[in-house]
Amino acid sequence: DYTKIINGRNPIVAHEFLGASVEGKDVIIVDDMISSGESMLDTAKELKRMKARKVFICTTFGLFTGGLKKFDEYYENGIIDRVLTTNLVYQTPELLSKPYYINVDMSKYIALIIDNLNHDASLSDLLNPTGRINRLLAKYRAGER
């Protein structure tokens, strides 16, 4: 419902889980960004209520506009196990020091994108990992590890 704005944002009316049982399973919550993190934390709490074993939060842009206190609390209470965000936005030293936080370094991929664009090359090989996966599998099968 985009007609209501509360505290400068559209509130989430409901989260609906449509999959099979998550009981005893590790679950990954994926979103484009963490602003306050409220919706991801609500989802994590619901997954734990549904008896998920571990909950991992993964996002591209971790803004953490509401601070880290609630994430600390959820980690300490066993609701979330890890939070992963990329280094495509500034990460505070406080965030980087959290035991539950994993920094996903995207520097290599940004450099490859810039290089391809500067050489007027296609980005499709960067975006489609099939070739890289097949090469890794071939090396693995050949005994190279």
Predicted regions and their residues:
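PRPP-associated nucleotide enzymes
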Residues: 1-145
